[in-house]
Amino acid sequence: MKISFHGQSCIKIITGDTTILVDPFISGNEKCDLKAEEQMPDFIVLSHGHDDHVGDTVEIAKNSGATVICNADLASFLAVEDGLENIAPMHIGGKRQFSFGQVKLTQAFHGSQTVRDGRIVNLGFPTGIVFTIEDKNIYFAGDTGLFSDMKLIGELNPLDVAFLPIGDNFTMGPEDAAIAARFLQAKLVVPMHYNTFPLIAQDPHKFVASLDEGITGKVLEIGEGIEI
């Protein structure tokens, strides 16, 4: 399995002949190396409804026929407002089997809304995501602040990789993310959600260096991947 990082919180997971795109903020994202019109994933997974995470989901899903996995409220919005038909609604605490493995949604402390035709639309609760693929557990925290139940996430799902936001201001910053890494006890910690715009400017290498002894961190450059 290969997991690659494409700026902000966009990651791509390739397992066998299946491609999973997570939070595909591509158009308008100078930090992303992908082109929306070239993406043909089998699945798109969304952590929440903010524009810098939903991104190009509608265009990509319509072009590729990808199944969109997300919280039930966001799923309803994408179906009614954008005409998406191939959607797998879920909610926090639930898990579901797919052809590539299992998805479980966890809590996240953030918001989830968009503006459509001049009105603010609430798109349900934000989530984190635990993927179980090829007997590996990958935690994608989404946008969140630090919370103590991250310990429970790590205990229930021994983690091979954890993707954690470090940008501060809208999510936890590097100091809190280092505590999150301590709580989760993942084999590998990868920072995300930083340097896309000035308010979330951070030094990811400094974050990795700050991790507790025994916790391994890795900064993925744009387009770089890891094999697990």
Curated annotation (Swiss-Prot):
<dbReference type="GO" id="GO:0016787">
    <property type="term" value="F:hydrolase activity"/>
</dbReference>
<keyword id="KW-0378">Hydrolase</keyword>
<dbReference type="InterPro" id="IPR022877">
    <property type="entry name" value="UPF0173"/>
</dbReference>
<dbReference type="InterPro" id="IPR050114">
    <property type="entry name" value="UPF0173_UPF0282_UlaG_hydrolase"/>
</dbReference>
<comment type="similarity">
    <text>Belongs to the UPF0173 family.</text>
</comment>
<dbReference type="InterPro" id="IPR001279">
    <property type="entry name" value="Metallo-B-lactamas"/>
</dbReference>
<dbReference type="Pfam" id="PF12706">
    <property type="entry name" value="Lactamase_B_2"/>
</dbReference>
<protein>
    <recommendedName>
        <fullName>UPF0173 metal-dependent hydrolase Lm4b_01588</fullName>
    </recommendedName>
</protein>
<dbReference type="InterPro" id="IPR036866">
    <property type="entry name" value="RibonucZ/Hydroxyglut_hydro"/>
</dbReference>
